[in-house]
Amino acid sequence: MIFINFYNTAPDYYLQNVAIKNISHKYNFVKVFPIGKSLCGRKINALSIGNRKNPVLYACTFHGMEWFNTLLILHFFEEICCAYKERKIIYEVDIFEVLNKRGLVVIPCVNPDGVEIQIHGASSCPKYEKLINKITDNTNHWQSNARGVDLNHNFNAGWQQLKKAETEQGITGPAPTRFGGRRPFSEVETMALCNFCLKEKFSFAIAFHSQGREIYSEYKDPPKRSIELGERFSKYSGYKIANPPKIATGGGFKDWLIGYMKTPAITVETGLGENPLPASDYLKEYELIRKALVKCLDF
C-alpha cells in the first residue's frame, strides 16, 4: 500500500484528499472528479477506472461515524488499480478484461462535513457551528450533515412513511442522526448524488454503511438482480441477508435507486461493534469482504 499511515487513522477530509491524490498520481488512468460539494463547500469526490459507458457504483460514508468504509473502499480501489495496471487475476476475475467492459466508480465519502464534525467537532463547520452545538454537546456520535439532516433519510423513496417513524421516536428537527429533513432531497449532498446517478445510469450500485455484517437488498418490489446481487455479496463475504429496522426503512439511497431508478442496488453494513468502528479493525474486515467486492465487479 502506498500510504500506510492513512489506513491507521480516522480519514478526515485532508487525509482523504492526500490519499486520492496519491492514487491518481500513481495510476494515471484513474479519473478523479467532484460530483458536487457539501454544505460547507467540501468536494464530494469520485474516482473512476475502466469503461464509463457501462459503470457500476460503490458509494460510502453517508454518515459521519462511518468513515471506516472510506478506508475499505480506497484500499479496494487501490488494489484494483494495481491489478488493472499489472493485468492480474484476482479470485479468477481478470480485472483488466472486466474493467474494459465495465467501469468502476467509487465515492469514498458522500458526507465529508459529517465526518469532519465527528472527528474534529462543530468548529470544523463554522457556518453551522452554532446549530450543531445547539443540537448536541457531544459530536462523537454525529451521523448527519452540517445542518443536522441524515442523508440516508433524505432520498425520495418512502420518505413520508419514514417521517412518521422518525416522529414516533421523537425526532422532529435537526439531530445528530435519523432526521430526514423537511422534504426529500433538501440537502445539497443528496441532490449531488441523485443528479450524478441520473446522468451516469449505473448498471448496479452498492451503498456501504456500518455496522452489523448485514446486507439489505429489498425495497418494495426490487429488481431480481438486486436480490441476486445481495446473494452474491453474501456468498463471498459470509454477511447475512437481513431486513433493516423500521426507522431505517425508506428514505435511503438504495431505496431510491430501486424505487425510482429501477437500478439493482444493495446496502452493505460492514463490521461489528459500535460506530465509529476503529481504524485498527479495517484490515480484518477488508479481508473478509475482499472477495465479494471483486466478484461483484463481474456480476
Spans of features found by a protein language model:
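Active-site/substrate-binding loop(s) of hydrolase catalytic cores
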Residues: K53, W67-F68, H75, C81-E218, ...
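N-terminal carbohydrate-binding/catalytic regions of secreted carbohydrate-active enzymes
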Residues: K31-G36, C40
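C-terminal accessory segments enriched in acidic
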Residues: M1-A19, K26-V32, K88, Q161-F299
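Proline/glycine-enriched tight loop/beta-turn segments at coil->beta junctions
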Residues: G50-V56
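A short loop-to-beta-strand scaffold at the N-terminal edge of the catalytic core in hydrolase folds
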Residues: C40-S48
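Generic recognition of short, well-ordered alpha-helical segments
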Residues: I44, F68-L72, E228, S280
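Structural recognition of the beta-strand scaffold that forms the well-ordered cores
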Residues: P34, N45, L57-A59, V105-P108, ...
